[in-house]
Curated annotation (Swiss-Prot):
<feature type="coiled-coil region">
    <location>
        <begin position="776"/>
        <end position="805"/>
    </location>
</feature>
<dbReference type="Pfam" id="PF00023">
    <property type="entry name" value="Ank"/>
</dbReference>
<feature type="repeat" description="ANK 1">
    <location>
        <begin position="66"/>
        <end position="95"/>
    </location>
</feature>
<dbReference type="Pfam" id="PF12796">
    <property type="entry name" value="Ank_2"/>
</dbReference>
<feature type="coiled-coil region">
    <location>
        <begin position="571"/>
        <end position="724"/>
    </location>
</feature>
<feature type="compositionally biased region" description="Basic and acidic residues">
    <location>
        <begin position="372"/>
        <end position="384"/>
    </location>
</feature>
<dbReference type="InterPro" id="IPR002110">
    <property type="entry name" value="Ankyrin_rpt"/>
</dbReference>
<keyword id="KW-0677">Repeat</keyword>
<feature type="repeat" description="ANK 5">
    <location>
        <begin position="198"/>
        <end position="227"/>
    </location>
</feature>
<feature type="region of interest" description="Disordered">
    <location>
        <begin position="301"/>
        <end position="343"/>
    </location>
</feature>
<keyword id="KW-0175">Coiled coil</keyword>
<feature type="region of interest" description="Disordered">
    <location>
        <begin position="355"/>
        <end position="402"/>
    </location>
</feature>
<feature type="coiled-coil region">
    <location>
        <begin position="431"/>
        <end position="480"/>
    </location>
</feature>
<feature type="repeat" description="ANK 3">
    <location>
        <begin position="132"/>
        <end position="161"/>
    </location>
</feature>
<dbReference type="InterPro" id="IPR039497">
    <property type="entry name" value="CC144C-like_CC_dom"/>
</dbReference>
<feature type="repeat" description="ANK 2">
    <location>
        <begin position="99"/>
        <end position="128"/>
    </location>
</feature>
<dbReference type="InterPro" id="IPR036770">
    <property type="entry name" value="Ankyrin_rpt-contain_sf"/>
</dbReference>
Length: 823
């Protein structure tokens, strides 16, 4: 996975890919991936973490499914207490997670300064890199935390650490437009001469990402403004290609200051060099006033500076000027001051601009006003001027041919240059996208070749035509002084009429010559006008053709850029997937090795455990047998005792019932006898009715008592019936429990035959114990029922006694009443 690239203008896509890695508030937590100690670390529960470590000390460096320790999660969440606890327990402080990030990198990434300081104080290594090649200092730069960066540097962080794109923290701060961090790193002596993988300096990156403030800071640090990247472009070329006039002006002013400082060594030649330098830079910007041959030169030279020709510009200038070997550069008037500069830096700059002056000369009209004035003033040196102009024109044609040849050769050799440097534009993966980019640029290369060849032919024809026109104009200009001189002679001859006849004949000849020359001049002027009109029409036609070619080139460039962006995205995605698969493969291999080792260890443990288990099983079977026998004996004794008790209780109840029935029969006999006596005494009672009226009240009371006693008797009988029903239920329950006990004993026997089912044995034992408890509960209930039955028997017996006593008292009352009546 790449952090950033430079595939788009001023770093739009670069910033987006940076945010993909650097933004975010920590880990994505899933509860299924965590252990207990990891959950406690995420929550910040130091007490729970300590309890986990007390239970299992091996959990101190335990990894979750994402290869994160508790220290990683605590640092990402900012729980200082948990971090101090883990560090004091001597945990691994530089352990890496799935993305190869240490807890220190994660703390800096999440801007948890307190956790980062604790880790640094306990010896965390600040120079370890993650899978993106970033150190903790890179993350501190992105978050623009100067305090964190200060702590990292004070604990030995390397200020020139490189990521995967060879970016130091300073270059990374420039890419992210972190002006505050740039100032901080420069104060901490970070190297301003560092370059990235494309050999771009800090100033070039600041220009590319449109950061005037950072450019100003770097210029104050006296950075090398003449440094070039792999394509031979300097910082000013970047500013021109992106139309950043403000930054270009800053760089030009800085270059002027450099040239002024060299003034004491260079002398007066510096002023001319600076003026040439400034004028040529201004002319290199796109202007709307360029006409005439400017169209031809614009078609010969590529429009964008962002596609430089192979090699540096001053070397090309030397090759162009000295390539033909027909004349030195001193013949050209605009190149004379630049040859006098002695300072190497200024000399290199001026040499780079000499080529631009030669190109700019082609854009100017061939016959300028200065040249015309120069020709008018130099009447005596006309042949020399003519020869010089001819040599200059031939030199210009040769130079234009060389420029067009160089552009065509540059277009032809651009693919080879791209293969050397790995890209046309700075991109994220130059080596991996080489083949894809070659395919994309091959079509563009062929189109550029054809366009350049056609434009070269047109420009050559245009130059030849302009050369003929120029020669005619020069001849006309050369004839004009002779005509003027002849006119002066004719005027002088007119003013001196007293001269000889020979002078008059000379004047007449001169007048004839003057007329002929005037006629020739008029003809030449007409031809010049017609040629100018033709040239204007052709120029308009060429301008239209150039616009069409520009539009097609722009469309092709957009298409190429889109293809390049798609290729970079696919390559980025494939690289990301490949890195993820590699990391996953290494992780799985490590887990496989661990599992193999643990499997071997477990097999050895299983063998030892099997021997122990066999001995334990034999002991357990013996103990279970004895326990079972004891329980069976106990249950039998319990059953026998319960049966004996129940039988004795039932016999007692039966005896009591028989006794009560006998008593009832006796009372019935007595009652019948009393009835007979009552019949006998009824007649006497009729006689003694008066006496009975007094006794009736007492009798009614006794009757009420007897009714109450009857109700009590009925209730007692109902209770006896209930007790008998309950007794039957208890007997059924006892039978059911006996059946359950028998079933449990059978299950226990079956389970003991299967020694591996320990849990079933324990469950059966528990059921056995519960059944014993139920038996005890039932015994208690039976005892309660027996007590209730005894109580009912007593109440019944008491009722019978009271009943008999009531009957006897009634008889006695009746007897006393009868006796009273008789008396």
């Amino acid at each position: 996975m790449k952090l950033f690239g430079f595939g788009s203008r001023r770093g739009q896509t670069a910033q987006g890919s940076i945010d993909h890695v650097y933004t975010g508030s920590g880990y994505r937590i899933r509860d299924s991936e965590l252990q207990k100690i990891h959950r406690a670390a995420v929550k910040g529960d130091a007490a729970e973490v300590e309890r986990c470590l007390a239970r299992r000390s091996g959990d101190l460096d335990a990894l979750d499914k994402q290869h994160r320790t508790a220290l990683h999660l605590a640092c990402a969440s900012g729980h200082v207490q948990v971090v101090t606890l883990l560090v004091n327990r001597k945990c691994q402080i530089d352990v890496c997670d799935k993305e190869n990030r240490t807890p220190l990198i994660q703390a800096v990434h999440c801007q948890e300064e307190a956790c980062a300081v604790i880790l640094l104080e306990h010896g965390a290594n600040p120079n370890l890199k993650d899978i993106y090649g970033n150190t903790a200092l890179h993350y501190a730069v992105y978050s623009e935390s100067t305090s964190l960066a200060e702590k990292l540097l004070s604990h030995g962080a390397h200020i020139e650490a490189l990521d995967k794109d060879n970016n130091t923290p300073l270059l990374f701060a420039i890419i992210c437009k972190k002006e505050k961090m740039v100032e901080f790193l420069l104060k901490r002596k970070a190297s301003s001469h560092a370059v990235d993988r494309l050999r771009r300096s800090a100033l070039m990156l600041a220009v590319y990402y449109d950061s005037p403030g950072i450019v100003n800071i770097l210029l104050k640090q006296n950075i090398d403004v003449f440094a070039q990247d792999m394509c031979g472009r300097d910082a000013e070329d970047y500013a021109i290609s992106h139309h950043l006039t403000k930054i270009q002006q800053q760089i030009l002013e800085h270059k002027k200051k450099i040239l002024k400082k060299e003034k004491s060594d260079v002398g007066s030649s510096d002023e001319s060099a600076v003026s040439i330098f400034h004028e040529l830079r201004v002319d290199s910007l796109p202007a709307s006033d360029d006409k005439d041959l400017n169209v031809a030169t614009k078609q010969c030279v590529p429009e964008k500076v962002s596609e430089p020709l192979p090699g540096s510009s001053h070397e090309k200038g030397n090759r162009i000027v000295n390539g033909q070997g027909e004349g030195p550069p001193a013949k050209h008037p605009s190149l004379k001051p630049s040859t006098e500069v002695e300072d190497p830096a200024v000399k290199g700059a001026v040499q780079r601009k000499n080529v631009q002056t030669l190109r700019a000369e082609q854009a100017l009209p061939v016959a300028s006003e200065e040249e015309q004035e120069r020709h008018e003033r130099s009447e005596k040196k006309q042949p020399q001027v003519k020869e010089g102009n001819n040599t200059n024109k031939s030199e210009k044609i040769q130079l234009s041919e060389n420029i067009c040849d160089s552009t065509s050769s540059a277009a032809a050799g651009r693919l080879t240059q791209q293969r050397k440097i790995g890209k046309t534009y700075p991109q994220q993966f130059p080596k991996k996208l080489k083949e894809e980019h070659d395919r994309c640029t091959l079509k563009q290369e062929n189109e550029e070749k054809t366009n350049v060849n056609m434009l070269y032919k047109k420009n050559r024809e245009e130059l030849e035509r302009k050369e003929k026109q120029y020669k005619k104009e020069v001849e006309a200009k050369q004839l004009e002084p002779t005509v003027q001189s002849l006119e002066m002679k004719s005027k002088t001859a007119r003013n001196t009429p007293n001269r000889d006849f020979h002078n008059h004949e000379e004047m007449k000849g001169l007048m004839d010559e003057n007329c002929i020359l005037k006629a020739d001049i008029a003809i030449l002027r007409q031809e010049i006008c017609t040629m100018k009109n033709d040239n204007l029409e052709k120029e308009n036609k060429y301008l239209k053709d150039i616009k069409i070619v520009k539009e097609t080139n722009a469309a092709l460039e957009k298409y190429i850029k889109l293809n390049e962006e798609m290729i970079t995205e696919t390559a980025f995605r494939y690289q990301q997937e490949l890195n993820y698969l590699k990391a996953e493969n290494t992780r799985l291999n490590a887990e496989l090795l661990k599992e193999k080792e643990s499997k071997k260890r477990l097999e050895a443990d299983i063998e030892s455990y099997q021997s122990r288990l066999a001995a334990a099983i034999s002991k357990h079977s013996e103990s279970v047998k004895t326990e079972r026998n004891l329980k069976l004996a106990l249950e039998r004794t319990r059953d026998v005792s319960v049966q004996v008790e129940m039988s004795s209780a039932i016999s007692k109840v039966k005896d009591e019932n028989e006794f009560l029935t006998e008593q009832l029969s006796e009372t019935q006999i007595k009652f019948n006898a009393l009835k007979d006596k009552f019949r006998k005494t009824r007649d006497s009672l009729r006689k003694k009715s008066l006496a009975l009226e007094t006794v009736q009240n007492d009798l009614s009371q006794t009757q009420q008592q007897t009714q109450e006693m009857k109700e009590m008797y009925q209730n007692a009988e109902a209770k006896v019936n209930n007790s008998t029903g309950k007794w039957n239920c208890v007997e059924e329950r006892i039978c059911h429990l006996q059946r359950e006990n028998a079933w449990l004993v059978q299950q226990l026997d079956d389970v003991h035959q299967k020694e591996d089912h320990k849990e079933i044995v324990t469950n059966i034992q528990r059921g056995f114990i519960e059944s014993g408890k139920k038996d005890l509960v039932l015994e208690e209930k039976s005892k309660k029922l027996m007590n209730e039955c005894d109580h009912l028997k007593e109440s019944l017996f008491q009722y019978e006694r009271e009943k008999t006593e009531g009957v006897v008292s009634i008889k006695e009352d009746k007897y006393f009443q009868t006796s009273r009546k008789t008396i």
